[in-house]
A protein has these predicted regions:
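Nudix hydrolase/Nudix homology domain
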Residues: 32, 97-150, 155-157
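Conserved N-terminal beta-strand and adjoining loop/helix that marks the start
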Residues: 1-21, 41, 72
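Alpha/beta enzyme core
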Residues: 144-159, 195, 202, 212, ...
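Hydrophobic faces of well-ordered beta-strands that scaffold small-molecule active sites
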Residues: 131-138, 160-162, 190-192, 206-209, ...
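Active-site-adjacent beta-strand/loop module that shapes the phosphate/pyrophosphate-binding cleft
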Residues: 73-96, 121
Length: 300
């Protein structure tokens, strides 16, 4: 019989650089010395949002005045399972201080610089390092595809997905190499829709799977970054279960129509709560209205 799930509320606080506030677990706690996002167990009868605000104040002295639900997922430790209800704090008051004697640190989510990180927080930290804009490039002509990818970078895309489903594998790999070289000065991460082997041969940062491939996949492929297309809620749940890093949620016909017109579809990170980070067509994605405070306090 599986163990019951412990409900946990977590708060993500970022400064004006986008750095994230982490706390080191004390010697009195399980997993002492591990670094984590502020948070803790949800009390009986308490809402997840109220628990996140309470835990943040109790641990760091920060009072959240505006926040929104962001991610919600289950993590299995060897002896227990926890469901993390993660909130992004948009506005807050106070000077961060370790009120329980713990050390605090502002870290770059992509390169935290502190270790070890509590395993249950790894997915959230990875998601915090994803960009806000993603571009899907769908051109079989290498020159036009490269031009579309460069245009996407000029518009701020930090992730590029290359789709060329009508190409043979070797053609797809050559196309991806051309695009990767073209956008290298801008530094986006590039994913190729295809197999893990194709992505590796192309020198891509990872692979991307359509919804049909997702449903056929028994497990996450061996790539650094894996994105998937999701048609509905069941696809999103499956993607989270398979260990996808993010999902594109867009009607396939709309995506295909956009690509036929220009070979480029821009998508924005959606601000609503989900099992994993979602990107939607830029015109329909929830606007991220987060504003970071100009003064973030001095740590002790």
């Amino acid at each position: 019989m599986s163990s019951p799930v412990i409900e946990v509320a977590v708060a993500v606080v970022q400064d004006d650089r986008g750095h994230v506030l982490l706390a080191e677990r004390t010697a009195r706690q399980v997993a002492a010395g591990f670094w984590e996002l502020p948070g803790g167990k949800i009390d009986s009868g308490e809402s997840a949002s109220a628990a996140a605000v309470r835990e943040l104040d109790e641990e760091t002295g920060i009072h959240a005045t505006a926040f929104r639900p962001w991610l919600c997922y289950v993590h299995a430790f060897p002896t227990k399972r926890v469901r993390l209800h993660i909130f992004r704090v948009e506005r807050w008051r106070g000077t961060p201080v370790g009120r329980e004697g713990q050390r605090l640190a502002w870290v770059d989510p992509a390169e935290p610089g502190v270790a070890p990180l509590l395993p249950s927080n790894a997915r959230a930290m990875f998601a915090l390092g994803l960009p806000q804009l993603l571009a899907v490039v769908d051109h079989e002509d290498p020159a036009r595809a490269a031009a579309a990818a460069i245009a996407a970078c000029d518009r701020g895309a930090g992730l590029i997905v290359i789709r060329a489903p009508r190409c043979a594998p070797d053609q797809r790999i050559a196309l991806a190499r051309r695009i990767i070289a073209a956008v290298a000065p801008a530094g986006p991460r590039v994913l190729l829709q295809g197999s893990a082997l194709e992505a590796q041969r192309a020198g891509a940062h990872g692979a991307f799977a359509c919804s049909a491939t997702l449903r056929r996949s028994p497990a996450r492929p061996s790539v650094r970054l894996w994105g998937v297309a999701c048609d509905d809620a069941s696809d999103r749940a499956l993607a989270a279960q398979r260990g996808a890093d993010f999902a594109i949620e867009a009607p396939p016909l709309l995506l295909a129509a956009n690509n036929r017109q220009a070979g480029l579809t821009m998508l924005r990170a959606d601000g609503t709560a989900a099992e994993l980070p979602l990107f939607k067509p830029a015109a329909t994605a929830a606007r991220d209205t987060s504003r970071f405070p100009a003064t973030t306090g001095v740590l002790t």
